[in-house]
């Protein structure tokens, strides 16, 4: 039996191995055998000390089950079986040899089990150990049912019954059965294993209940113990339950009660009336309720506060709420007022007790305190000189519109100064909102000199320099906000503040008190500015205008304003020098004022830049600006101190801008201020230095307003002012230099209004600076700088500032300033340009616009959809087609041909229309372009081998074209003829249109043209060449190139019908191309209908050509080619080529060979038929039909 068993066992092992991918099956068998052997080995020991082992096992198993209780459902817990299997494997050999008899009894069932597990393992290697256990258990149950019938063990039967009774009993019986199995030898062991299996089967219900606890056997236990008994494993579930029950018992709250320590009790309870009451209950937040471990036997005292939920209508806690509900006294009833709720009142009308009286008094006092607090705040505001706003109605915002708070004149000054202290934030908000309002008022034509000066006077005042203040306001205000530049250029449209500026210009003595005029000055500025006598107020208004326009645009008025500020000691002294100069300056300001006002939006940036040059101290200009627009002034004063005409305007524009674009403007403002400070340092004038003290004042005042708008800008302005004051003192003459720069910048910024702004600026500049010299210089500089500085938006501000500098220099000496201005202009222009690149206005330079316009002019005379820039490129690209040819070749023929024919039809129609309507222009322009195109085309066609069609001129080119065509032909036989026609088409289109069309035409022609395309193109081109040249007035080479492209397409149709004809007709490379591509495309398009379909897709003239044959296509091709050349549309030539080339496919053979010598005879009939063919084509052919159909 031993041998046979071994043999059987070997077979079984082999079978297992055969069914398994891994050795798992065999290992499992060995492991199980080893397990059984181990059990047998330990039987004696177990007999001697069964109870001892049982206890130890039970303890270990219980621990293991406790550990794996949480792993019941995870199959991974089955890994423990791996360990058990491994442990069994260790004893496999010894057990196998020793227990051969045992294997007889156990071998078959185990083999079955092994096979099953083996098959399972085969399907899933990684999990075979894990899931093998579960399957193994099932197999055990099966085995016990099938094979264990003979072993009806009393213990087992009793065990199965007991299992159902109780988990604890089941565990005990299982252990007993396990012990008995250990005692029994051979059959007894197999019986026990069967019992175990059957026990598992009996316990499957339990396992399900436990969710297969057996799956998660303790991995931690020794392998032998784990693996010793399957039943033991199965019983783990019950064990787990029992253990879990015990564990739950330990975890029961009852247990916790017992565990509570005095410390724990003291932590969670409070002694209340001699009892330890749950402190959470007393606080009204014990969530355990009746289950709480601590006593809740206490009456909760209500907190002496009204329940806010009860007050709002409903409290979910009801009587349990710790806050007062209806016990709270009714304040209406007890205060003597009538309680409309009466008996239904939710609050108590009972007599007041000491407690309730305290509560009532507290409530009433709270209301009084609120009222008193408001009154105290209002009193504080009044003390500070701030008129408190009326209490807004409920639902209205806290901040009313600024006008409600105060007028922008005197009240604004006080208000702003107060804001600078404690109310800076609110004022800044008001000013931000109000400034645009003021600008709008100026635009509307209102007085708002005061408002404007305070809010947005900078632009308007200066704008008004030349026109009356009212005119300045109306025109300036409207232009100031957005189109400062353009309006600045137009004198009438200066900033609304310009009237103030005007007065400043008018009054030689600018108002010295720039800072005082700031709030009140603006209103006065309108009147006093008009009056030379009121220097201070005009200065104030000027300062806002200077910020807006006077300071910016009238470099001199700006300086005058600034100078008065700078020279506040001698208000008007700087400007008093010459009222005429003042007027000129004001005019200049007015001219630049629109730019100023426009810049006001960009102003704060440019203002800083221009302020130093215009004002010796930015603070001066800031003071002026602040006067004009205290809130905005902060930003705009920077412009003011920068107060180059344009920059100031830029700054002024930003005055409203701070509200609109504070972040961006501030960023630009900082940039411009820094840049312009450098410029100002170079161009700062001495007079600017004079008002440095006032600048400080203005800076302080401005700082207050600036604080309202933003502390960062304020600090920057202060720093810039200090720096610029020194620079201005040092570089007062340099401001003259900056004047040309500023005008340029102003013009650049007024680019949108280039026509208006330059003119206006020119006029004021002329007035300010020796109307002829300085003005033309300024204008030229302004124009040039625009173009030069057009890159930067800040440059406009600088140009405006330059104008102001010019005005100021006119006072100080325009000649000197102009000299320095030129040098400074270059430096400043460079700086401005670099800075301007950062500004979004960089793209607006006049030069840039002019170039596109000139290009547009080219387009206009061409009147084609072709971009004129391409013709320039086309010239270069004409030679590029060689390189481009490979590009179109890679394109898919069907796609490119389909796409190209449709556009070419449109293009051909356009070309025909354009050719007819503008034949003269096209002949001239196209003759120029076509000549170039013809030359290029001849070269390209020669390269492509189309010269054969054209004749001698093309003959030389054909040689060049032949190798190219051949090269292209060799690698891409199908596309080479197309490339030839494409090259021709591209040449035509390049001559007229440019390189970009070449690839289009090439793919289009290559796809539709086919092998016959190149041949027919060369053949048909000679006849078409004279027609194209004569009709289009283009050189024969050009028209022939187009014709060659067309002939290429015509051969396509013919090529589809007969490729051999194409090959014969084609000469030189054309014949080769026809043969190669003809074979390819003829095979692709063996049917003539595809060629026809292609033709209809192409323009009508092309279709006509295809229908009528070489003559028609030739005639059409010359026309279309001429047209194509005129518009320089590559798509048109391609279309013509695609459509015409195909019809000429067969003809081109004939045409090319004889056509080269005599193309004209073909052209005559072709022309006649072309017209018909065009009409017919449009009628008969479907433009959407695929050329490959």
Swiss-Prot record:
Keywords: Coiled coil, Metal-binding, Phosphoprotein, Repeat, Zinc, Zinc-finger
Residues carrying Phosphoserine: 1158
Disulfide bridge positions per record: none
Cross-referenced SMART domains: ZnF_C3H1
Protein name: Zinc finger CCCH domain-containing protein 6
Composition bias type Pro residues, residue spans: 505-525
InterPro entries the record matches: Su(sable)-like, Znf-CCCH_ZC3H4/6/8, Znf_CCCH, Znf_CCCH_sf
Pfam families cross-referenced by the UniProt entry: zf-CCCH, zf-CCCH_9, zf_CCCH_4
Coiled coil: 27-73, 353-385
Biased composition (Low complexity): 461-478, 639-659, 1009-1020, 1056-1069
């Amino acid at each position: 039996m031993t041998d046979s068993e071994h043999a059987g066992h070997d077979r079984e092992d082999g079978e297992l191995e055969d069914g398994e991918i891994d050795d798992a099956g065999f290992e499992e068998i060995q492991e199980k055998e080893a397990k059984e052997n181990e059990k047998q080995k330990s039987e004696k020991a177990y007999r001697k000390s069964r109870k001892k082992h049982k206890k130890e096992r039970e303890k270990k198993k219980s621990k293991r089950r406790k550990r794996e209780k949480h792993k019941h459902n995870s199959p991974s817990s089955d890994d423990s079986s791996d360990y058990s299997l491994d442990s069994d494997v260790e004893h496999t050999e010894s057990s196998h040899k020793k227990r051969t008899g045992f294997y007889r009894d156990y071998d078959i069932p185990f083999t079955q089990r092994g096979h099953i597990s083996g098959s399972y393992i085969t399907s899933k290697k990684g999990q075979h150990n894990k899931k093998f256990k579960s399957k193994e258990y099932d197999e055990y149950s099966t085995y016990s049912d099938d094979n264990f019938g003979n072993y009806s063990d009393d213990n087992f039967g009793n065990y199965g019954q007991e299992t159902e009774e109780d988990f604890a009993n089941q565990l005990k019986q299982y252990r007993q059965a396990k012990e008995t199995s250990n005692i029994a030898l051979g059959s007894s062991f197999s019986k026990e294993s069967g019992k175990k299996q059957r026990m598992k089967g009996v316990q499957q219900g339990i396992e399900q209940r436990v969710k297969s606890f057996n799956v998660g056997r303790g991995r931690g236990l020794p392998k032998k113990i784990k693996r010793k008994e399957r039943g033991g494993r199965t019983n783990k579930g019950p064990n787990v339950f029992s253990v879990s029950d015990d564990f739950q018992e330990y975890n029961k709250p009852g247990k916790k009660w017992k565990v509570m320590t005095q410390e724990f009790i003291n932590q969670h309870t409070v002694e209340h009336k001699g009892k330890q009451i749950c402190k959470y209950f007393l606080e009204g937040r014990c969530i355990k309720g009746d289950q709480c471990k601590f006593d809740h036997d206490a009456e909760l005292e209500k907190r002496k506060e009204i329940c806010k939920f009860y007050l709002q209508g409903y409290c979910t806690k009801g009587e349990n709420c710790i806050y007062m509900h209806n016990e709270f006294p009714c304040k209406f009833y007890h205060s003597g007022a009538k309680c409309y709720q009466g008996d239904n009142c939710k609050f108590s009308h009972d007599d007041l007790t000491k407690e309730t009286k305290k509560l009532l008094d507290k409530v009433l006092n709270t209301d009084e305190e609120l009222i008193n607090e408001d009154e105290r705040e209002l009193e504080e505001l009044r003390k500070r000189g701030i008129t408190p706003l009326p209490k807004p109605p409920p639902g209205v915002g806290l901040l009313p519109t600024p006008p409600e708070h105060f007028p922008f004149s005197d009240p604004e000054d006080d208000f702003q100064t107060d804001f600078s202290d404690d109310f800076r934030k609110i004022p800044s908000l008001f000013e931000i909102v109000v400034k645009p309002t003021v600008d709008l008022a100026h635009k509307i034509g209102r007085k708002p000199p005061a408002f404007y000066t305070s809010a947005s006077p900078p632009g308007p005042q200066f704008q008004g320099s030349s026109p009356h203040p009212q005119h300045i306001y109306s025109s300036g205000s409207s232009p100031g906000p957005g189109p400062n530049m353009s309006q600045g250029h137009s004198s009438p449209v200066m900033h609304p503040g310009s009237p103030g500026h005007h007065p400043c210009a008018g009054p030689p003595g600018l108002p010295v008190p720039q800072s005082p005029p700031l709030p009140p000055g603006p209103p006065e500025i309108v009147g006093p500015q008009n009056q030379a006598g009121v220097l201070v107020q005009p200065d104030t208004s000027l300062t806002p205008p200077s910020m807006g326009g006077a300071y910016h645009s009238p470099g001199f008025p700006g300086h005058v304003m600034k100078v008065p500020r700078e020279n506040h000691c001698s208000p008007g002294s700087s400007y008093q020098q010459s009222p005429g100069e003042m007027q000129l300056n004001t005019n200049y300001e007015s001219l630049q004022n629109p730019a100023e006002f426009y810049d006001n939006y960009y102003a704060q940036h440019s203002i800083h830049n221009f302020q130093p040059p215009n004002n010796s101290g930015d603070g001066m200009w800031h003071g002026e600006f602040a006067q004009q627009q205290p809130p905005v002034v902060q930003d705009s004063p920077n412009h003011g101190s920068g107060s180059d005409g344009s920059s100031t305007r830029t700054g002024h524009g930003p005055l409203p801008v701070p509200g609109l674009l504070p972040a961006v403007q501030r960023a630009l403002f900082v940039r411009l201020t820094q840049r312009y400070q450098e410029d100002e340092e170079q161009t700062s004038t001495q007079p600017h230095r004079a008002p440095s003290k006032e600048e400080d004042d203005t800076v302080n005042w401005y700082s207050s307003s600036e604080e309202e708008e933003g502390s960062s800008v304020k600090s920057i302005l202060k720093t810039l002012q200090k720096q610029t004051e020194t620079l201005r003192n040092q570089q007062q003459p340099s401001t003259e230099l900056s004047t040309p720069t500023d005008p340029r910048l102003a013009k650049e910024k007024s680019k949108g209004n280039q026509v208006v702004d330059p003119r206006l600026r020119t006029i004021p500049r002329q007035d300010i600076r020796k109307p002829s010299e300085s003005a033309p210089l300024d204008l030229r500089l302004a124009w040039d700088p625009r173009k030069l500085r057009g890159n930067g938006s800040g440059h406009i501000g600088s140009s405006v500032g330059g104008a102001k500098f010019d005005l100021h220099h006119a006072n100080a000496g325009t000649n000197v300033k102009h000299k320095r201005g030129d040098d400074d202009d270059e430096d400043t222009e460079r700086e401005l340009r670099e800075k301007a690149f950062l500004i979004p206005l960089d793209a607006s330079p006049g030069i840039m616009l002019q170039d596109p316009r000139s290009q547009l002019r080219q387009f206009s005379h061409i009147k084609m959809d072709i971009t004129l820039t391409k013709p320039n490129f086309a010239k270069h690209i004409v030679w590029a087609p060689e390189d481009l040819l490979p590009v179109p070749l890679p394109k898919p023929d069907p796609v490119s041909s389909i796409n190209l024919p449709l556009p070419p039809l449109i293009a051909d129609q356009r070309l025909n229309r354009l050719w007819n309507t503008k034949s003269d222009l096209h002949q001239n322009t196209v003759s120029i372009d076509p000549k170039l195109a013809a030359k290029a085309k001849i070269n390209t066609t020669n390269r492509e081998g189309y010269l054969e069609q054209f004749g001698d001129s093309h003959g030389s080119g054909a040689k060049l074209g032949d190798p190219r065509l051949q090269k292209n032909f060799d690698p891409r036989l199908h596309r080479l003829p197309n490339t030839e026609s494409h090259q021709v088409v591209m040449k035509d289109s390049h001559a007229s249109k440019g390189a970009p069309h070449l690839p289009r035409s090439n793919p289009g022609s290559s796809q539709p043209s086919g092998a016959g395309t190149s041949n027919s193109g060369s053949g048909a081109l000679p006849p078409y060449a004279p027609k194209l040249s004569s009709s289009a007035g283009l050189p024969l080479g050009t028209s022939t190139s187009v014709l060659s492209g067309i002939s290429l397409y015509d051969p396509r149709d013919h090529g589809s019908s007969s490729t051999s004809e194409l090959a014969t007709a084609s000469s030189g490379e054309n014949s080769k191309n026809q043969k190669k591509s003809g074979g390819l495309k003829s095979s692709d398009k063996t049917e003539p209908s595809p060629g026809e379909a292609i033709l209809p897709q192409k323009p009508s003239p092309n279709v006509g050509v295809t229908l009528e044959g070489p003559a028609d296509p030739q005639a059409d091709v010359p026309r279309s080619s001429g047209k194509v050349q005129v518009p320089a549309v590559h798509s048109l030539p391609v279309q013509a080529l695609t459509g015409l080339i195909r019809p000429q496919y067969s003809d081109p053979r004939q045409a090319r060979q004889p056509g080269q010598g005599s193309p004209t005879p073909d052209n005559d009939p072709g022309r006649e038929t072309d017209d018909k063919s065009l009409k017919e084509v449009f009628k008969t052919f479907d433009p959407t039909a695929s050329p490959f159909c």
